[in-house]
């Protein structure tokens, strides 16, 4: 997928040894729905910012019928999908106070382990890595931090019926020429129970 020209509204982050003014895209968040039974589902993303792309088209939310295997049928156009896609500008300050510095050549193995621990299944993990690995594997190092409430509070999900399990993986990362010291991030394992919703996406800082 070609990169869209998208920017964050201006904000400042203290990063490494200086202050960096950044305006960067939130890329390829995709949402998967796994109800226990075939279920009509309403999905809204309440964004502190603005959308730059959605697929299928976002009409004040998505109204769909979801199957247990993850297949999604749109009630707007009767087409079927395997996920809901959005991309946009989110007004928040990513947190790099903890994270990981990973050699480019070791990024694939790192992501496989980290994403599995964070709760992604094989297909979700593979799609995440297929999208991001080409941008990361040739860097000397990658600084990686998975965002938590500082992201989800600015891009809340409103889903009806309410899911039993919600897994949201947002990776903020930056290519590095040299390794730096950083406090390791604690990754919490998530167990899937009942109606499960999964979202993943990422942000690169250059």
Residues covered by each model-derived region:
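Protease-labile, long low-complexity intrinsically disordered regions enriched in Pro/Ser/Thr
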Residues: 21-206
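C-terminal motif of bacterial Sec signal peptides marking the signal peptidase cleavage site
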Residues: 17-18
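Sec-dependent signal peptide recognition
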Residues: 3-10
